[in-house]
Amino acid sequence: MGIPVVVPVAAAYSCSSSLAAPPRAAAAAARAPSRAHVAAAGMSSRASSFVGGSGGDLAAVAASVAARPRRAGSGGGGALGCKCLFGLGVPELAVIAGVAALVFGPKQLPEIGRSIGKTVKSFQQAAKEFETELKKEPGEGGDQPPPATPTAVSGGEEKGLEASSSKESA
C-alpha cells in the first residue's frame, strides 16, 4: 500500500463514485484505475503503480485532475508565456538573439536581419501566389473551350488534291 498523500481529495472522489456503484466496486475502482484514466493522466500503468504504490488513490486523483476541463485563458499564457514562433516563447527567442549577437557581432547583425526579412517576404509572396492560383483553377476549367482536335481528311478530297498537283507538274 502506498502512503496516502492527498487523502481528503481522494475521499471526495470516492464518495461520488460510491453513489453509482456498490462500495466494494467503488473501492476497487479507486485502487485500480482504468487504462483510460491512467492514459489521461499521461502515465503508463507501470508509472502509475510506481507513483501511487499499488496504483491506488494518487493515480486516481491524478487521472481525475487531468480529465478536468481547463479554462480557456490557462493555456500557458501570461506575459512571457506566449508561443510566438515555431513553439518558441519570448525567453527562448531572447536567448537565441543573444547567442546570434555573440556569434556574428554587431556589424553583421543588421545585414543578416535584412536578408532574413527578404527571405521571409519572398516566401510569403510565393505562398500568396500559390493560394491565388489554387482559387483560380476550379473556375477556369469550365470557361475554356476544349482544344481543337485535327480531323481526318476524307478519301475524295485526297484524290482531288493529287489530281491538281499532277496537272501542275505536267
UniProtKB/Swiss-Prot annotation:
<protein>
    <recommendedName>
        <fullName>Sec-independent protein translocase protein TATA, chloroplastic</fullName>
    </recommendedName>
</protein>
<comment type="function">
    <text>Part of the twin-arginine translocation (Tat) system that transports large folded proteins containing a characteristic twin-arginine motif in their signal peptide across the thylakoid membrane. Involved in delta pH-dependent protein transport required for chloroplast development, especially thylakoid membrane formation. TATC and TATB mediate precursor recognition, whereas TATA facilitates translocation.</text>
</comment>
<feature type="transmembrane region" description="Helical">
    <location>
        <begin position="85"/>
        <end position="105"/>
    </location>
</feature>
<keyword id="KW-0793">Thylakoid</keyword>
<comment type="subunit">
    <text>In thylakoid membranes, TATC and TATB form a large receptor complex, containing about eight TATC-TATB pairs, which binds the precursor protein. Twin arginine signal peptide promotes pH-triggered docking of TATA oligomers to TATC-TATB receptor complex, inducing a conformational switch of TATA that results in activation of the translocase. TATA dissociates from TATC-TATB upon completion of translocation.</text>
</comment>
<keyword id="KW-0809">Transit peptide</keyword>
<keyword id="KW-1133">Transmembrane helix</keyword>
<dbReference type="GO" id="GO:0043953">
    <property type="term" value="P:protein transport by the Tat complex"/>
</dbReference>
<keyword id="KW-0472">Membrane</keyword>
<dbReference type="GO" id="GO:0045038">
    <property type="term" value="P:protein import into chloroplast thylakoid membrane"/>
</dbReference>
<comment type="similarity">
    <text>Belongs to the TatA/E family.</text>
</comment>
<feature type="transit peptide" description="Chloroplast">
    <location>
        <begin position="1"/>
        <end position="61"/>
    </location>
</feature>
<keyword id="KW-0813">Transport</keyword>
<keyword id="KW-0653">Protein transport</keyword>
<dbReference type="GO" id="GO:0009977">
    <property type="term" value="F:proton motive force dependent protein transmembrane transporter activity"/>
</dbReference>
<dbReference type="GO" id="GO:0009535">
    <property type="term" value="C:chloroplast thylakoid membrane"/>
</dbReference>
<keyword id="KW-0934">Plastid</keyword>
<keyword id="KW-0811">Translocation</keyword>
<feature type="region of interest" description="Disordered">
    <location>
        <begin position="130"/>
        <end position="170"/>
    </location>
</feature>
<keyword id="KW-0150">Chloroplast</keyword>
<feature type="topological domain" description="Lumenal">
    <location>
        <begin position="62"/>
        <end position="84"/>
    </location>
</feature>
<feature type="topological domain" description="Stromal">
    <location>
        <begin position="106"/>
        <end position="170"/>
    </location>
</feature>
<feature type="compositionally biased region" description="Basic and acidic residues">
    <location>
        <begin position="130"/>
        <end position="139"/>
    </location>
</feature>
<dbReference type="InterPro" id="IPR006312">
    <property type="entry name" value="TatA/E"/>
</dbReference>
<dbReference type="GO" id="GO:0042651">
    <property type="term" value="C:thylakoid membrane"/>
</dbReference>
<dbReference type="InterPro" id="IPR003369">
    <property type="entry name" value="TatA/B/E"/>
</dbReference>
<dbReference type="Pfam" id="PF02416">
    <property type="entry name" value="TatA_B_E"/>
</dbReference>
<keyword id="KW-0812">Transmembrane</keyword>
